[in-house]
């Protein structure tokens, strides 16, 4: 069963979000096989995060609720609310069909947003040191 999960950030939670990046990535690593798509939502400036979208293929609604509400950012109060809905992948594609859009390096989820904010992050594009 496919689910759309939209976590919306609380105002002023960017610092806490940054602090929890490694925990968030580790949590998402556990769902790599189930992940259809993921990424941050952004403010009009195209840089400031306002939330996160995850589309996952999970066995049932209980597993989807666990995914959404056990997420470290949700547990720590980064998110103000969660929208969880059934979803249908009518195109039949996933982010894994476009590897340049979803880099995964040595078991750690990375994003351009994270690399820009954490210069000492272990995130590096594939093939670089």
Where are these regions (language model features)?
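Conserved, structured core segments of small domains
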Residues: 1-129
